[in-house]
Amino acid sequence: MGKYFDELERAMQWLGQQPDTMFLGQAVEYKGTAMTNTLVNVPRQKLLEMPVNEEMQMGITNGIAVAGTVPISLFPRWNFLLCAVNQLVNHLDRLKAYS
């Protein structure tokens, strides 16, 4: 493909080799987006396929991070990412107060 894609694929492979990472999102386990092709060499047990629900995905991403794993959350439909902002603004930033 191109240099950008090659570097993105190389970065995803490196992240996939790290013991504390996890990939989640739409089309991470199954073909569907260009990002799927960057995950071909990532171990399958590190991939968590998500339904189309950006806010839920961000909430799960926050929980995974709080539990100590490094989440790599893929949002192929970036124009719907604004739906996930609630989880960041109204939940993650108040985590200390809730704990």
Model-inferred region functions:
Residues 1-99:
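Thiamine diphosphate
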